[in-house]
Amino acid sequence: MDLFEYQAKKLFAEHGVPVPTGKTATTPEEARAIATELGGRVVVKAQVKTGGRGKAGGVKVADGPDDAFAKATAILGMDIKGHTVHSVLVEEASNIAEEYYASFLLDRANRTFLAMASREGGMEIEEVAATKPEALARIAIDPLKGVDAAKAREIAVAAKLPEAALDGASELLAKLWTVFVKSDATLVEVNPLILTGDGRVVALDGKVSLDDNADFRHPEHEAFVDVAAVDPLEQKAKEKGLNYVKLEGEVGIIGNGAGLVMSTLDVVTYAGEEFGGKRPANFLDIGGGASAEVMANGLSIILGDPAVKSVFVNIFGGITSCDAVANGIVQALKIVGDVSTPLVVRLDGNNAEEGRRILAEANLPVVKPVDTMDGAAKLAAELAAAAA
């Protein structure tokens, strides 16, 4: 999960990383009130989960409360790279002497952690890496040792930071590492990291990506979820413990195993070309779950999408037997109730024949058993086209 700047800075502040004083506003009136409280010049910054805000006009300096009102009016509602601005961060303006760059990230290729730092801050780090690679220090971090004061200073020196910034930057880097580890982050980035006119080192911006796989250790991370941006069906699936991603098609997909579901998406897309370009409406992997409750939850979520005109249930029985899945489907339809959307069901593998027999005996009008994956995909696309 990527955080907004204000959320990243909240984490920073909790671990002692110096950040400018500021608050978020969702209306120009709130921005004016915050500017009045802060006094002096302020910066009004669009809160979106993408880069390039400054170039897009999403970061503006205001000379007082009324100017903050005007700047917030201009920024709120903006579209920045497909992201609508719903809030702004209003914070005290900083006296910037120099700008640097610092980050900690998960280095997947080398199966370790990596620190990156540079004296060239305030611009896209990809640009620095491409045009001046020698200006970007890369320091591998031993996961068992982490970043102590000595390691933090090593990073700052490798980045060729000036003497005036070394102590402050080293202290900040050590605290930034604590944020990275304690929050189970995959990325913690400060760009720019600034040296102020009075010699302080401050995180002027902040970017944090949290590892969703560690959510069970961090119930407090739930507060960071951008509810306005989360699809309600995806949120419902998450609450039910289902791996669901909403897509833009008409054929609902249920499968067991991510690989099989991905293959199903491809097969349905191919089959749909014959029927006006019908496409998968979702990704839903029920894993080893064949219970009536799991199937009912899955069907309820998929059928909650008004774009879905048919459902393709594609199961390859392994540890989970096909007869258990078939019973789950029969019971799920009773639980969900009043289902008119056709379900094309393909069962193969462990106890497939028994599963097909169960579905046949249930004699459910909406269930359309098909033996092959290609045949089932074609029928699902055809039924979706007929219902459109």
Swiss-Prot record:
It catalyses: succinate + ATP + CoA = succinyl-CoA + ADP + phosphate; GTP + succinate + CoA = succinyl-CoA + GDP + phosphate. One of its GO terms (molecular function) is succinate-CoA ligase (ADP-forming) activity. Binds 1 Mg(2+) ion per subunit. Coiled coil: none annotated. Belongs to the succinate/malate CoA ligase beta subunit family. Succinyl-CoA synthetase functions in the citric acid cycle (TCA), coupling the hydrolysis of succinyl-CoA to the synthesis of either ATP or GTP and thus represents the only step of substrate-level phosphorylation in the TCA. The beta subunit provides nucleotide specificity of the enzyme and binds the substrate succinate, while the binding sites for coenzyme A and phosphate are found in the alpha subunit. PANTHER family: SUCCINATE--COA LIGASE [GDP-FORMING] SUBUNIT BETA, MITOCHONDRIAL (PTHR11815:SF10), SUCCINYL-COA SYNTHETASE BETA CHAIN (PTHR11815). This is Succinate--CoA ligase [ADP-forming] subunit beta.
